[in-house]
Structures are given as structure tokens and as C-alpha cells.
């Protein structure tokens, strides 16, 4: 499957989705609100292609062809004829509602409207449109070119046809899919990692064990490639705190009640690798 894809948001996730899709033969429109954001996104895509070429995993002419299939724009109307639209912006329902309302007015009827959200129920996002049956979750993982999984999420009104189209799209860009049949906040993967990170942070906060030993226990005891606190630093403590707060608000399940230490870290700006300090010093 290949066609025209629109990606809304040129950040790390949006650029990654655009990258793998263009490489798979999709014509991609990458849209963001500023030229600066688009430049950062397209520069990141080119740099990633260059790394794959240098490692012998991609031919230079294929990288050039993929780049040529990406059009960066601030014009939302440029996505009107897309077959698949993937929104990849900040995890805030109000922002997503604004985008989906706008897309609903301009995108052709047969297109699917997908969200890369990792935690917000698709049913809530779809409520901003007049076509909730065409709205589906396509949760990719970072870094998109390296991670194999795509979590497909069915909203309350998502049609079988829309879900099948989303699966064909994800598989066409090299991903293996799991299906979330009931879109509880956090779906499958975010609920699992948030529960693990929250418990690990509570253990560290209460002095049961150090961050290093907690992570080592998960790596050597459970075969995890990375421990939960190192994962939090990589993902961003702020992002995981935001996600677990969303899940807790929705579920009132105490295992998602983040410890005070995580809140204080975020307030202090100690959010992981991107700030130089999180559960570890970087």
C-alpha cells in the first residue's frame, strides 16, 4: 500500500513517521505551523537518512528519492487530498480537537484521520469530528525508524474498514501492529510503562533501592533492554508524568498516582536526557 500521507506536526515523532513513510514510497506532506519547525524536522530526516546510508543500510539514491517525496508546508489546505492523515502533536486534548476539527472540514471523505497519541482515548479525539468512524489511533514508537511496533487503537465508533486501512498503512512502512479494542487512557503500552515507571520511582523515593539497582533488576531479572528509570530519562520525565496523570485522572487507579519526587523533578526542570539531569545525570 502507498498513496498520499499527511503528517501534522514536524517534531521528533512526526518527522520519524514522515521519514519511514517516504522511504516506503508514500508521497508525504509534512505540515507544521512555523517554517522553523519544518526546517528542524526535515533536517532531522535528512540526517537520519545520511546515517543509514553511511552504515550501508540505505542506498544514497533511495535516500534522495525518499527526501524528494516529502513536501514541507505551513498550509493546512495542502493535506486536503491525503489518503491517510496522521496527527503527531503535543498530548493535549484541546490542541488535538482544534486540529481534528480543521481536518474534518478539508480532508476528503474517504480518508482516515489518525492520531499518534500515546495516552488520550481515540473516542475523545474523534468527538471533534463529524466522521468518528474514520478516526483511529496509530501510536508509533520513538525512534520511529528503529522501533517495530505500531499500536492501533479502535475508538468507540471506529469502523472495521478504517482500522484495516490503518493496519495496511502501518504494515506498509514496516511496522508490526497490535490492536487495542477498547481505548482506555494509555492503551496497552503506555499503561504498562507508566505503571512500571511509577512503581520504580516510588521504590527509589522511599529508599528501597537506588535507581541503578532498580534498573539493573529489570534488565537482568526480566530481560528488559533498559530499566524503567533510564527509560523515563530517555522519553522525558515530563512526558511520562503527563501521561500517567492522564491515566490516573481517567481511571482513578492508585498504581498510576505518580510520586511527589517525579512532580518535583519536573518542576525543577530535571526531565531526563534532554535537560542533562533526571533520575540520572547525563
Stretch-by-stretch model annotation:
Residues 1-51, 55:
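NAD(P)+-binding Rossmann beta1-loop-alpha1 motif at the extreme N-terminus of oxidoreductases
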Residues 161-164, 171-182, 201, 205-206, ...:
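NAD(P)-dependent Rossmann-like dehydrogenase/reductase catalytic/cofactor-binding core
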Residues 33-40, 51-113, 120:
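Rossmann-like NAD(P)-binding element
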Amino acid at each position: 500500500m502507498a498513496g498520499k500521507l499527511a503528517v501534522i506536526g514536524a517534531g521528533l515523532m512526526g518527522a520519524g513517521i514522515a521519514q519511514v513513510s517516504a522511504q516506503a514510497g508514500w508521497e508525504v506532506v509534512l505540515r507544521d505551523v512555523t517554517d522553523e519547525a519544518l526546517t528542524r524536522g526535515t533536517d532531522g530526516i535528512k540526517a537520519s537518512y545520511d546515517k543509514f546510508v553511511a552504515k550501508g543500510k540505505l542506498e544514497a539514491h533511495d535516500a534522495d528519492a525518499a527526501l524528494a517525496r516529502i513536501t514541507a508546508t505551513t498550509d493546512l489546505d495542502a493535506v486536503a487530498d491525503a489518503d491517510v492523515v496522521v496527527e503527531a502533536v503535543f498530548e493535549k486534548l484541546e490542541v488535538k480537537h482544534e486540529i481534528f476539527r480543521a481536518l474534518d472540514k478539508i480532508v476528503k471523505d474517504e480518508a482516515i484521520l489518525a492520531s499518534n497519541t500515546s495516552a488520550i482515548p481515540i473516542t475523545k479525539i474523534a468527538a471533534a469530528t463529524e466522521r468518528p468512524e474514520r478516526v483511529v489511533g496509530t501510536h508509533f514508537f520513538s525512534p520511529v525508524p528503529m522501533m517495530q511496533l505500531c499500536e492501533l487503537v479502535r475508538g468507540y465508533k471506529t469502523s472495521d474498514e478504517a482500522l484495516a486501512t490503518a493496519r495496511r498503512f502501518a504494515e506498509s512502512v514496516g511496522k508490526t501492529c497490535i490492536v487495542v479494542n477498547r481505548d482506555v487512557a494509555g492503551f496497552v503500552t503506555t499503561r504498562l510503562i507508566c505503571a512500571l515507571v511509577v512503581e520504580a520511582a516510588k521504590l527509589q523515593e522511599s529508599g528501597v533501592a537506588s535507581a541503578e539497582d532498580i534498573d539493573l533488576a529489570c534488565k537482568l531479572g526480566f530481560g528488559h533492554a533498559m530499566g524503567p528509570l533510564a527509560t523515563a530519562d530517555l522519553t522525558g520525565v515530563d512526558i511520562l508524568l503527563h501521561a500517567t496523570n492522564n491515566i490516573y485522572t481517567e481511571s482513578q487507579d492508585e498504581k498510576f498516582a505518580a510520586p511527589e519526587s517525579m512532580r518535583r523533578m519536573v518542576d525543577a526542570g530535571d526531565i531526563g536526557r534532554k535537560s542533562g539531569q533526571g533520575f540520572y545525570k547525563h
